Curated annotation (Swiss-Prot):
Organism in which the protein naturally occurs: Pinguicula caerulea
Entry-linked HAMAP family: RuBisCO_L_type1 (MF_01338)
Modified residues (N6-carboxylysine): K191
RNA-binding as UniProt keyword: no
Protein name, per record: Ribulose bisphosphate carboxylase large chain
GO cellular component, one term: chloroplast
Subcellular location field: Plastid, Chloroplast
Note on how the cofactor is bound: Binds 1 Mg(2+) ion per subunit.
A Pfam family recorded for this sequence: RuBisCO_large_N
Listed EC numbers: 4.1.1.39
Site for Transition state stabilizer, residues: K324
Active-site residues per Swiss-Prot or TrEMBL entry: K165 (proton acceptor), H284 (proton acceptor)
Cofactors named for this entry: Mg(2+)
């Protein structure tokens, strides 16, 4: 029969350096740290086996199927520069291993079991190449960047947002009041914090009602379309959809979901509902650092970002870049492009291991939020460009005169930066001067500049921003 019981080395079956990848394969780049004494070929083959058809011993039922057709293959291994005992192992998976339109199944297969594997000291999924044949089975973002701009009638600049603080403890009425002040002052959006769901001090239905009132009042006063990210995340999918239905009945433009804590199945369900009912979907990445913070173990955020674009979301938080190290800036911009663009070339300097073709799947707006204020505006405008959402929580609500003047300061700073850029001025070199000039005409901006002036404006021109 040719069946021989016993344990055999993975590399005999799953390490195939001669393999030529197919256009339909899902390709993965793993950072593998083998246990002492385990050769990299065996470690890479073990990853390929455990995340596809393999098990720890030979089983007679292998003879009932065609392993060559279904097995994952480790087809290339390269050492990580500057690290000892770390390797990038490239694995190709046949498309038939995955259920169509299911990010959940894709992750269960590729990262579900293999991370606890004894032969590995650590394992990190650095990147995935999703083939067009698989992408075409996903709806993707409910609307995408262009449709969102058309819905909001806002063009030629980044959108402005603000997370309402304190995030927990306000009553629904006071929460709605804070929303109204920010929107009236000139912001496009305000936001529920990721952990605002339906707590005893503020039940979700009350919050939705008062926020809708704030939206309609501020729209009437400013003549602009406004929105508030109403967090629909809940303990069950049914409850989540119930909240989204109520938001739609109120006529508001956008809802929100925590896609990692809520899960990909719930997220994809909500994204389908949002497309069918004309709601935009804002995605928060709460819990991402548990998965992506360690350099040698876990999943890099660029993979989670790709998964979100497949599962569906119109905005996603993607870090701020400002004040960070140069290398992190390039890597952040790498996955920002993966979210927005239709076609992204392989570029290892930006952490992009594979060329990715999104075949017309709508793009996702990256959201910069966390510790930013008016002095960062030139840097953010230059780095992120027009297709982004800039969110100032404390940078709006921390204004000495209140929320509405804080919103005015941010809007004036943004309009000044966009105008300066359109006139051909160098935001990197002249950023501070541009903000100072604008503050002469805006007492609100002048007050904001004074409050945050001791925080340095750390931004040098970067050549790799094209």
């Amino acid at each position: 029969v040719g069946f021989k019981a016993g344990v055999k080395e993975y590399k005999l079956t799953y390490y195939t350096p001669e393999y030529e990848t197919k256009d339909t394969d899902i390709l993965a780049a793993f950072r593998v740290t083998p246990q002492p004494g385990v050769p990299p070929e065996e470690a890479g083959a073990a990853v390929a086996a455990e995340s596809s058809t393999g098990t720890w011993t030979t089983v007679w039922t292998d003879g009932l199927t065609s392993l060559d057709r279904y097995k994952g293959r480790c087809y290339n291994i390269e050492p990580v520069p500057g690290e000892t005992d770390q390797y990038i192992c490239y694995v190709a998976y046949p498309l038939d291993l995955f259920e169509e339109g299911s990010v959940t199944n894709m992750f269960t297969s590729i990262v579900g079991n293999v991370f606890g594997f004894k032969a590995l000291r650590a394992l990190r999924l650095e990147d995935l190449r999703i083939p067009p044949a698989y992408i075409k089975t996903f709806q993707g973002p409910p609307h995408g960047i262009q449709v969102e701009r058309d819905k909001l009638n806002k063009y030629g600049r980044p959108l402005l947002g603000c997370t309402i603080k304190p995030k927990l403890g306000l009553s629904a009425k006071n929460y709605g009041r804070a929303v109204y002040e920010c929107l009236r002052g000139g912001l496009d959006f305000t936001k529920d914090d990721e952990n605002v769901n339906s707590q005893p001090f503020m039940r979700w239905r009350d919050r939705f009602l008062f926020c809708a009132e704030a939206i309609y009042k501020s729209q009437a006063e400013t003549g602009e379309i406004k929105g508030h990210y109403l967090n629909a995340t809940a303990g069950t999918c049914e409850e989540m959809i119930k909240r989204a239905v109520f938001a739609r009945e109120l006529g508001v433009p956008i809802v929100m979901h925590d896609y990692l804590t809520g899960g990909f199945t719930a997220n994809t369900s909500l994204a389908h509902y949002c497309r069918d009912n004309g709601l935009l979907l804002h995605i928060h990445r709460a819990m991402h650092a548990v998965i992506d913070r360690q350099k040698n173990h876990g999943i890099h955020f660029r993979v989670l970002a790709k998964a979100l674009r497949m599962s569906g979301g119109d905005h996603i938080h993607s870090g701020t870049v400002v004040g960070k190290l140069e290398g992190e800036r390039d890597i952040t911009l790498g996955f920002v492009d993966l979210l927005r663009d239709d076609f992204i070339e392989e570029d290892r300097s930006r952490g992009i291991y594979f060329t990715q073709d999104w075949v017309s799947l709508p793009g996702v707006l990256p959201v910069a939020s966390g510790g930013i204020h008016v002095w960062h505006m030139p840097a953010l405008t230059e780095i992120f460009g027009d297709d982004s959402v800039l969110q100032f929580g404390g940078g709006t609500l921390g204004h000495p005169w209140g929320n509405a003047p804080g919103a005015v300061a941010n809007r004036v700073a943004l309009e000044a930066c966009v105008q300066a850029r359109n006139e051909g001025r160098d935001l990197a070199a002249e950023g501070n001067a541009i903000i100072r000039e604008a503050s002469k005409w805006s007492p609100e901006l002048a007050a904001a500049c004074e409050v945050w002036k001791e925080i340095k404006f750390e931004f040098k021109a970067v050549d790799t921003l094209d």
